[in-house]
């Protein structure tokens, strides 16, 4: 068999897909994620533990901790049932009124790509997506997940072997072409 090689760009795509799958796998019991093109219509919500991110019937997008509102889009209009909030393919999260006009946006347009909006257990709502550009020299942890740099390292160490990617999931990243963990 021929030797398999992989570019840093391909490895980054694999790492991005693995991170997204990890986030999605940890949400099997509760719906707390929107992916490209998905949205919340009046009465629908994302939920995790005591937090609820809901598109209300009045067109106001609100984040609740238990029954206390802690953030709102301030787009509420009495009697305007039919609004929706959409995670767009360009990275922007937008609230549209009943006539399809944008009334609020996250202003996070980054170009077409793979984006997810996550209601996290730390009461934060975050949009994650493809990096636009990177030197590949960073090392950081995001929301309890290990982030792999383009050079194949995490916190200065090799990622070959078991890597804890969040509090509940362990993943083994394999070197391409060897079959070994």
UniProtKB/Swiss-Prot annotation:
Signal peptide interval: 1-30
Secreted recorded as keyword: yes
Binding positions for alpha-D-mannopyranose per the UniProt entry: 56, 58, 60, 64, 71-72, 74, 88, 90, 92, 96, 103-104, 107, 114, 120, 122, 124, 128, 133
Top-level taxon of the source organism: Eukaryota
Annotated Bulb-type lectin domain residues: 31-140
GO molecular function, one term: protein homodimerization activity
Intracellular or extracellular location(s): Secreted
Keyword tags: Antiviral protein, Disulfide bond, Lectin, Mannose-binding, Plant defense, Secreted, Signal
InterPro entries assigned: Bulb-type_lectin_dom, Bulb-type_lectin_dom_sf
Disulfide bonds: 59-83
A cellular-component GO term for this protein: extracellular region
An individual GO BP term: defense response to virus
Known partners and oligomeric status: Homodimer.
Additional record remark: Has an inhibitory effect on SARS-CoV-2 in Vero E6 cells (IC(50)=4 ug/ml). Viral replication is inhibited by 80% at a concentration of 20 ug/ml, and 50% inhibition is observed at concentrations of 5 ug/ml and 10 ug/ml.
Function, in words: Mannose-specific lectin. Shows agglutinating activity towards rabbit erythrocytes. However, it does not show agglutinating activity towards human erythrocytes. Has insecticidal activity against the cotton leafworm S.littoralis and the peach potato aphid M.persicae. Also displays antiviral activity and therefore may contribute to defense against infections.
Name of the protein in question: Mannose-specific lectin
Organism in which the protein naturally occurs: Allium sativum
């Amino acid at each position: 068999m021929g030797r398999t090689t992989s570019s840093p760009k391909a490895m980054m795509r694999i790492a991005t897909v693995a991170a997204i799958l990890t986030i999605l796998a940890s949400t099997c019991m509760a719906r707390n994620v929107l992916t490209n093109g998905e949205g919340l219509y009046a009465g629908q919500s994302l939920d995790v533990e005591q937090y609820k991110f809901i598109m209300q019937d009045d067109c106001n997008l609100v984040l609740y901790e238990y029954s206390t509102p802690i953030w709102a889009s301030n787009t509420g209009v009495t009697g305007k049932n039919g609004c929706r909030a959409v995670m767009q393919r360009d990275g922007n999260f937008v609230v549209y009124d009943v006539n399809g006009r944008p009334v609020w946006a996250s202003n996070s347009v980054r170009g077409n790509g793979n984006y997810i909006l996550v209601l996290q257990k730390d009461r934060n709502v975050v949009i994650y997506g493809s990096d636009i550009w990177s030197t590949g020299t960073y090392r950081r942890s995001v929301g309890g997940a290990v982030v792999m740099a383009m050079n194949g390292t995490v916190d200065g160490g090799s990622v070959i072997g078991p890597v804890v990617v969040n509090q509940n999931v362990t993943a083994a990243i394999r070197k391409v072409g060897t079959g070994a963990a």
